[in-house]
Swiss-Prot record:
Subcellular location: Cytoplasm
Metabolic or biological pathway: Porphyrin-containing compound metabolism; protoporphyrin-IX biosynthesis; 5-aminolevulinate from L-glutamyl-tRNA(Glu): step 2/2
Alphabetical keyword list: Cytoplasm, Isomerase, Porphyrin biosynthesis, Pyridoxal phosphate
MF terms in GO: glutamate-1-semialdehyde 2,1-aminomutase activity; pyridoxal phosphate binding; transaminase activity
GO biological process entries: protoporphyrinogen IX biosynthetic process
Organism the protein comes from: Coxiella burnetii (strain CbuG_Q212)
E.C. designation(s): 5.4.3.8
Subunit structure and binding partners: Homodimer.
Taxonomic classification: Bacteria, Pseudomonadati, Pseudomonadota, Gammaproteobacteria, Legionellales
NCBIfam families noted in UniProt: hemL (TIGR00713), PRK00062.1 (NF000818)
Record protein name field: Glutamate-1-semialdehyde 2,1-aminomutase
Family assignment from sequence similarity: Belongs to the class-III pyridoxal-phosphate-dependent aminotransferase family. HemL subfamily.
Length: 435
């Protein structure tokens, strides 16, 4: 029963568009009643109807330590006692900035903001200001927040000017946004051949987390770095999702690629609203007040958020933190795949440390956006609701990644696998294929 959630959802729709403050939370992609959460602890969510869920959303990525981690809660509580916001510098800004740079050597200086969207938007403004160029390249299926210039859908043509994918975004705003095909270096090279003197930057997720989960091919990222070097453009890694999750040094450390700028978010706030962007010293020095490129924020560097973020990042230095997290992720994903194969369910998966994507398809490994969107969304909807009914909370969209935290143990993973095995064993015939 979800009586209280249903009542709250009905009430919320009177006061908020769609009843939510971020569209995916409304369950529009899967149908049904969104769960209103009243408490979270470790790997669990508890909704207002007192139902407990094993959580594989993790607030969409920030909760790498699990919910209500004692060290993070203590740090935030202590900070609150000294005031909620100063509008002036505080020492923890310096400490967090230094730790970010220690973890990610490509970030020689960093600017704190309030969200991943602010981080990518500001990084692009800085890239345009530094290069004196206006055009940017992004990739079909990659999501970099809701800034106007990044809300672009290129349709079937890779080598086209962007078209707005939301009303309210002026055509002129996105005409300088070029869209290429993820993991297709030729599509990027063709854009440089045509607009070589106009391209300020490439922005890319090294592991794309919003077309389910698709890792970049190593030679693809190497090629992007070489093209930027050749044409004098900047390479921006959007590591809002992957930063400090897939490795302490982010995805850039796994690929051994040094971007010019990096956008961060999610984990660096420990659950508080924080974003950041940083990179080469000479580029960051072009930001106001040192340089001419303007960016500011009333709540940037908020003392409570800085304390929570600093406490979170300190926990990531624990011995074997990432090897343990990767092992749990692999245990979960390989367990899901083996059960799908045994039940003849058409399912494939991609995963990295602490993050995974499941796609209902018989095509094999998914490496491009076009494959991801061809996954069977109806199969996912059925799977999602069966998991939810059995106490497992997945992202309510077939195109969103799942997250696992340090608080998940083999107990939660194995219980999840038992639930999946049971779901697959009794699934409708339409879910099955011949293998």
């Amino acid at each position: 029963m979800v009586d209280h959630s249903a009542a709250l959802f009905n009430k919320a729709q009177n006061y908020m568009p769609g009843g939510v403050n971020s569209p995916v939370r409304a369950f529009g992609a899967v149908g049904g009643v969104p769960r209103f959460i009243k408490k979270a602890s470790g790997p669990y969510l508890i909704d207002v109807d007192e139902k407990k869920y094993i959580d594989y959303v993790g607030s969409w990525g920030p909760m790498i330590l699990g919910h209500a981690h004692p060290a993070v809660i203590q740090a935030a509580q202590e900070a609150v006692q000294n005031g909620l916001s100063f509008g002036a510098p505080c020492e923890n800004e310096i400490k967090l900035a230094a730790l970010i740079g220690e973890f990610m050597p490509s970030i020689e200086k960093v600017r704190m903001v309030n969200s991943g969207t602010e981080a990518t938007m500001s990084a692009l403004r800085l890239a345009r200001g530094v290069t004196g160029r206006s055009k940017i390249i992004k990739f079909e299926g990659c999501y970099h927040g809701h800034a106007d210039c990044l809300l672009v859908n290129a349709g079937s043509g890779a080598l086209t000017f962007g078209m707005p994918s939301s009303p309210g975004v002026p055509l002129g705003t996105v005409q300088d946004t070029l869209t290429a095909t993820f993991n297709d270096l030729d599509s990027v090279a063709a854009l440089f051949e045509k607009y070589s003197k106009d391209i300020a930057a490439i922005i890319v997720e090294p592991i794309a987390g919003n077309m389910n989960l698709i890792p970049a091919a190593p030679d693809f990222l190497t090629g992007l770095r070489e093209l930027c070097n050749q044409y004098g453009s900047l390479l921006i890694f959007d590591e809002v999702i992957t930063g400090f999750r897939v490795a302490k040094g982010g995805a850039q450390s796994l690929y051994n690629i040094r971007p010019d700028l990096t956008a961060l978010g999610k984990i660096i706030g420990g659950g508080m609203p924080v974003g950041a962007y940083g990179g080469r010293r000479e580029i960051m020095n072009q930001l106001s007040p040192e340089g001419p490129v303007y960016q500011a924020g009333t709540l940037s560097g908020n003392p409570v958020a800085m304390a929570a973020g600093l406490a979170t990042l300190k926990e990531l230095t624990a011995e074997n933190f990432y090897s343990n997290l990767k092992e749990k992720t692999e245990r979960l994903v390989m367990g899901i795949l083996s059960r799908a194969k045994a039940a003849k369910i058409p399912l494939t998966a991609n995963f990295s440390c602490g993050i995974f994507g499941l796609i209902f398809t018989s095509e094999g490994r998914v490496t491009r956006y076009a494959q991801a969107v061809n996954g069977n969304v109806e199969h996912f909807r059925s799977f999602f609701h069966k998991m939810l009914d059995n106490g497992v909370y997945l992202a309510p969209s077939a195109f969103e990644s799942g997250f696992i935290s340090a608080a998940h143990t083999n107990k939660e993973v194995d219980k999840t696998l038992d639930i999946i095995e049971n779901i697959f064993s009794v699934s409708e015939t339409y879910l099955r294929i011949s293998v």
